[in-house]
Structure formats: structure tokens, C-alpha cells
UniProtKB/Swiss-Prot annotation:
Keywords: Cell membrane, Membrane, Mitochondrion, Mitochondrion inner membrane, Transit peptide, Transmembrane, Transmembrane helix. The chain crosses the membrane at residues 107-127, 139-161, 206-226. It comes from the Eukaryota. GO terms for biological process: cardiac conduction; cardiac ventricle development; regulation of cardiac conduction. Essential for maintaining proper cardiac intercalated disk (ICD) structure and function as well as cardiac conduction velocity in the heart. Its association with SCN1B is required for stabilizing the perinexus in the ICD and for localization of GJA1 and SCN5A to the ICD. May regulate the function of the gap junction protein GJA1 and may contribute to the stability and proper localization of GJA1 to cardiac intercalated disk thereby regulating gap junction communication. Regulates mitochondrial respiration and mitochondrial DNA copy number maintenance. It comes from Bos taurus (Bovine). This is Transmembrane protein 65. Monomer. Homodimer. Interacts with GJA1. Interacts weakly with DSP. Interacts with SCN1B. Its main location: membrane. The gene is TMEM65. It is found in: Cell membrane; Mitochondrion inner membrane.
């Protein structure tokens, strides 16, 4: 998988407030949002505040000009260069194959797409659930006793720790998955946009997260059962 997953998860708008000259520049049309509209995306937008989106401003999707612009501003210069090269290559292949009738992906290709998307999400689900259980249990047995917080509050704090850890561990999970030797599925641009490919990709992610979360429950083996719960209730 590419490095786009953690960026999509925490993408921010790092654009600066434009000056008077930039504010007077015309805004790009709404149809130039992806791929073939890269030149329009580079044009400055209207005045925007520094930092993340305001509370009342909805987060734009990547199929809009504003959403694509925010995503581009969140990337480093090397990542933008790599993304631009891949977009040009992808669009050139799509234009060359535009007049050709693309065949639907074969069952073998769909199976490969499924596996390629499932493996990284097994790692994500495993780490997320395991860290949440361990952190939530320790919070309940330490801070929970002192502050008298409930089990659900301790679980919520454990989930916070798990999410923070996931931001830093996402890159390592992707690097480990790439070392398994699974290359990007060999599909044409038209085959990538077909519904069969998208369904296979989403199913792979869903199954991967499910398997990872089930495997991530292994810390429960090392924690006690009813006796520890009774002792905790007596202490509270």
C-alpha cells in the first residue's frame, strides 16, 4: 500500500492565507479536481484560516477541488512529485486505452486485489485492538482506582492511546506488509475503476480488519477473570 492511508486519516490544511493579489485571482472551476485538473488545483483559492478546518466547515472529499487541494497541501514535496508522476503515467495509459474495450478482471486478479488489501489491515486491526485492551486495562487498574472512573471510561481512554499509537505505527505496518513481496495488482485503468475491483478491495479491507481485531484480543488470555473483578469492586 502507498503512504496515502495515514495521510487520508489525518489530512490537514497547511495553506497560508493569500495576499490581496492572490485573493483577486479567479478561483478554478469546480470540474477540475483530480488527475487531469492538476494545473487548476495549483491555483490559489480564496482566503482560508491557518490550521485545520473550522468547526462549521465540512471536510471536503477528494473528488472536489477544495478537498483535493487540502490533500495536496498536506503532502511533502517528495510525495507531491511522486504523486504527480504516477498521475501522469496513469492518465497516459488511460488515454491510450480509452478506445479499447477493457475486459472485467479475472477471478485470479480479484483474488489478488483482495489479498493485497487484506494483509495490511490485519496488522492495523491487530495493533489497534491489542493496544486498546492493554492500555484500557492498565488505566482501569491504576488511574481508574484513584479517580473512580468507570470501565467504559477506561476503555475510551485505552482507545485514545490506541489511536495515538496507530498514527505512528501505520507506516511500519505498511513497510512490513510491503516486505512480503506483494506487488501492486497488474490492472488497467479501466479495470481499476470497475465495480468488481472496488468490491474486492473493500471486502479485503473489511475481512483484514476483522481478522486483525480478533487476533488482537490475545491480551485477554493474560488477564484474570472474575476474581480480579471482585477485588477491583472491593477496592472501589
Amino acid at each position: 500500500m502507498s503512504r496515502l492511508l495515514p495521510l487520508l486519516r489525518s489530512r490537514t490544511a497547511r495553506s497560508l492565507r493569500p495576499g490581496p493579489a492572490a485573493a483577486a485571482a479567479p478561483r478554478p472551476p469546480s470540474w477540475c479536481c483530480c488527475g487531469r485538473g492538476l494545473l487548476a488545483l495549483a491555483a490559489p483559492g480564496g482566503p482560508r484560516a491557518l490550521g485545520t478546518h473550522p468547526k462549521k466547515e465540512p471536510i471536503e472529499a477528494l473528488n472536489t477541488a477544495q478537498g483535493a487541494r487540502d490533500f495536496i497541501y498536506s503532502l511533502h514535496s517528495s510525495e507531491r512529485s511522486c504523486l504527480l508522476k504516477e498521475l501522469h503515467r496513469f492518465e497516459s495509459i488511460a488515454i491510450a486505452q480509452e478506445k479499447l474495450e477493457a475486459q472485467p478482471p479475472t477471478p485470479g486478479q480479484l483474488r489478488y486485489v483482495f489479498i493485497h488489501n487484506a494483509i495490511p489491515f490485519i496488522g492495523f486491526g491487530f495493533l489497534d485492538n491489542a493496544i486498546m485492551i492493554v492500555a484500557g486495562t492498565h488505566i482501569e487498574l491504576s488511574i481508574g482506582i484513584i479517580l473512580g472512573i468507570s470501565t467504559m471510561a477506561a476503555a475510551a481512554l485505552g482507545n485514545l492511546v490506541s489511536d495515538l499509537a496507530g498514527l505512528g505505527l501505520a507506516g511500519y505496518v505498511e513497510a512490513l506488509a510491503s516486505r512480503l513481496g506483494l506487488s501492486i495488482p497488474d490492472l488497467s485503468p479501466k479495470q481499476v475503476d470497475m465495480w468488481q475491483t472496488r468490491v474486492s478491495s473493500h471486502l479485503g479491507k473489511a475481512v483484514g480488519v476483522t481478522i486483525g481485531c480478533i487476533l488482537g484480543m490475545f491480551p485477554l488470555i493474560f488477564f484474570g477473570g472474575g476474581e480480579d473483578d471482585e477485588k477491583l469492586e472491593k477496592k472501589n
